[in-house]
């Protein structure tokens, strides 16, 4: 017998409690690792197609990026692999070098050897979130923004000598930045991450992803620093 303790539709994750005494006897917990590198080998464990024997498929990490999950319009960090992920594999661990680097997420219909997994930072965020007995979800800036690719537009805003900065077009109601930023500001940095004009940050050397990577590394109540350009200052 098992019961669902917590569920996150935005992450497509759930925490399940097994009530049977001794269910985990003889097992050893798997340790989490960080985000795998491109070309790292991975193995995905699961029970596809309703089988009763453990299936292991192997492949490599193709890319790490931000993309939409199944049940949300928000983009979160996601890993892509050429290891087969079939129905029934979802929720299985993705293992690299003996440690968990993610949770099998889905395959792309109509495409062979393309599967996706939820990287451990998202899984850990979910687990840390529910430690207090409540699920709060992922923090959001609550802004509408646009890229600043045009040299003339950048000059008008005072950021012509750098490639960083995105234009704030609107602050949504109840945004944590509602009384701090305003329309027309140029958002330059979050914490120590410079935001490129296309809205990306370098999350590790020579690899970029959506600037929300920085926001989504936080839990509610944690400090997030920002740097802006306003009126060319």
For each of these PLM feature ranges, what is it?
Residues 1-54, 87, 111:
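Conserved active-site neighborhood of the chymotrypsin/trypsin-like protease fold
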Residues 24-31, 38, 198-199, 213, ...:
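C-terminal, low-ordered peptide segments at domain boundaries
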Residues 19-29, 54-112, 120, 125, ...:
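Active-site region of chymotrypsin-like
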Residues 178, 189-227:
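PDZ domains, with a preference for the canonical peptide-binding region formed by the helix
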Residues 1-3, 37-43, 54-67, 121-124, ...:
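Beta-strand/loop subdomains of soluble extracytoplasmic proteins
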Residues 83-84, 88, 92-93, 146-195:
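PDZ/PDZ-like domain segments forming the peptide/carboxylate-binding groove
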Residues 32, 62, 124-166:
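PDZ/PDZ-like peptide-tail recognition elements
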Residues 2, 16, 39, 44, ...:
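Terminal peptide-recognition signature
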């Amino acid at each position: 017998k098992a019961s669902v303790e917590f569920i996150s539709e935005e992450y497509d994750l759930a925490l399940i409690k097994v009530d049977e005494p001794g269910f985990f006897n003889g097992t050893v917990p798997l340790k989490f690792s960080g985000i795998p590198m491109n070309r790292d080998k991975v193995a995905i464990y699961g029970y596809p197609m309703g089988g009763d024997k453990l299936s292991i498929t192997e492949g490599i990490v193709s890319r790490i990026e931000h993309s939409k999950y199944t049940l949300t319009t928000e983009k979160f960090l996601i890993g892509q692999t050429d290891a087969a992920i079939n129905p029934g594999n979802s929720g299985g661990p993705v293992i690299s070098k003996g440690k968990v680097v993610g949770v099998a997420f889905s395959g792309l219909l109509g495409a062979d050897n393309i599967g996706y997994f939820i990287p451990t930072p998202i899984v850990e965020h979910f687990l840390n979130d529910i430690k207090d007995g409540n699920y709060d979800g992922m923090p959001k800036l609550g802004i509408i923004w646009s890229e600043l690719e045009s040299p003339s537009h950048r000059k008008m805003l005072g950021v012509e000598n750098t490639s960083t900065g995105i234009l704030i077009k609107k602050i949504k109601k109840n945004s944590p930045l509602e009384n701090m930023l305003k329309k027309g500001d140029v958002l330059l940095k979050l914490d120590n991450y410079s935001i490129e004009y296309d809205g990306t940050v370098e999350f590790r050397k020579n690899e970029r992803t959506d600037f929300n990577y920085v926001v989504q590394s936080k839990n509610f109540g944690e400090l997030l620093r920002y740097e802006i350009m306003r009126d060319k200052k």
